[in-house]
């Protein structure tokens, strides 16, 4: 959020791997910003789709109550534009409850939740301390963890372990699934860590959520760089910021390419274009069983991806108008 407006001036790609300002996915207004793979508005739409499936359909969501419990920051409020619109369309009562940073004091918020008696809680926390504190507080007020859905940045093993038994049953979404049996992960484990060249003090973290997410991001950067070198006749040579951006917009991570790299299934297939910098727009739902995350859905997209895209374009257009930005022509 703090540096997004500097990218064009500095000619530097801002790779928001599933985080940051959502309307950065409109490459016409934000040509240097990439949300790939998938942004927060698609994420909240996938979560609400999952809730509807659990409740028996969208028609059963009318009259339901969802609390959006979040850290009081731009990040915590990021999903609200899409969430408010979906809630209004479905007849859902949305209750917004904020937590002052750093988020370790949550008792009053959970007492409010006990009073509200919501059907679901979406949790947008920051840091394992805040994230685990929410689960222990939920347990104290007897709010079921299988009615809580965590943001991607609260969806790691490090967020669950500190809460102990209180974490069991919690749902979370992923843009990169954990596991060390993906061929690339297994190869790194064998060839890098097996030869003593790894930099993790605890090698058991290889294949965890955050580690695999970092691997997914690294793969994307390397593929974008290779694209840039090939497109501009610079194979084996350094590229400029603008050329690297071109490489990003040429990303086409098909199932076949992901399999060739060795991460098929770990991330959703996606492609990028001049106008669309989001990528897959898909997330997988996981549930913590007390020891590990168990995948409970495949790669899910919002019920209406075009609706989410329209929200993105409208928000980006508003920003462009307010800041005298002429959107890039993508042909």
Role assignments for model-derived ranges:
Residues 4-12, 52-56, 84-92, 114-118, ...:
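Sec-exported extracytoplasmic/periplasmic mature domains
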Residues 7-10, 27-28, 60-62, 114-116, ...:
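Extracellular/periplasmic catalytic domains that process cell-envelope and extracellular macromolecules
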Residues 14-16, 20-25, 102, 144-163, ...:
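Venus flytrap/periplasmic-binding-protein-like
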Residues 22-23, 31-143, 148, 179, ...:
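Extracellular/periplasmic Venus flytrap/periplasmic-binding protein
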Residues 30, 34, 137-218, 301-302, ...:
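Extracellular/periplasmic periplasmic-binding protein-like sensory domains
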Residues 43, 47, 79, 184, ...:
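Catalytic-loop motifs flanking and including active-site residues across diverse enzymes
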Residues 199-211, 222-297, 325-326:
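Segments of small-molecule ligand-sensing domains
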Residues 299-328:
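Short, cationic low-complexity segments
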């Amino acid at each position: 959020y703090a540096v997004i407006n500097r990218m064009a001036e500095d000619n530097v790609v801002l790779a928001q791997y599933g985080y940051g300002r959502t309307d950065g996915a409109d490459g016409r207004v934000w040509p240097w910003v990439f949300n790939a793979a998938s942004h927060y508005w698609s994420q909240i739409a996938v979560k609400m789709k999952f809730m509807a499936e659990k409740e028996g359909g969208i028609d059963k969501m009318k009259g339901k109550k969802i609390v959006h419990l979040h850290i009081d920051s731009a990040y915590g409020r990021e999903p609200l534009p899409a969430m408010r619109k979906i809630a209004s369309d479905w007849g859902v009562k949305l209750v917004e409850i904020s937590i002052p940073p750093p988020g370790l004091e949550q008792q009053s918020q959970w007492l409010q939740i006990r009073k509200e008696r919501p059907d679901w809680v979406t949790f947008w926390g920051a840091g394992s301390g805040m994230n685990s504190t929410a689960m222990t507080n939920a347990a104290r007020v007897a709010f079921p963890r299988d009615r809580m859905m965590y943001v991607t940045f609260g969806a790691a093993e490090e967020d669950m372990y500190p809460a102990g038994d209180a974490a069991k049953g919690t749902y979370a979404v992923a843009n990169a699934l954990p596991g060390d049996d993906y061929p690339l992960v297994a190869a790194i484990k064998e060839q890098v860590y097996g030869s003593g060249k790894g930099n993790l003090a605890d090698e058991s973290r290889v294949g965890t959520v955050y580690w695999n997410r970092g691997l997914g991001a690294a793969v994307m950067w390397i593929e974008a760089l290779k694209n840039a070198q090939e497109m501009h006749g610079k194979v084996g040579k350094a590229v400029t910021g603008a050329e690297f951006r071109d490489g990003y917009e040429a990303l086409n991570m098909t199932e076949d390419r992901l399999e060739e790299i060795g991460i098929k299934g770990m991330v959703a297939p996606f492609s990028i274009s001049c106008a669309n910098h989001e990528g897959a727009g898909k997330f997988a739902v996981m549930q913590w069983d007390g020891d590990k995350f168990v995948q409970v859905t495949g790669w899910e997209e919002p019920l209406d991806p075009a609706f989410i895209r329209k929200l993105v374009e409208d928000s980006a257009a508003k920003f462009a108008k307010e800041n005298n930005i002429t959107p890039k022509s993508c042909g």
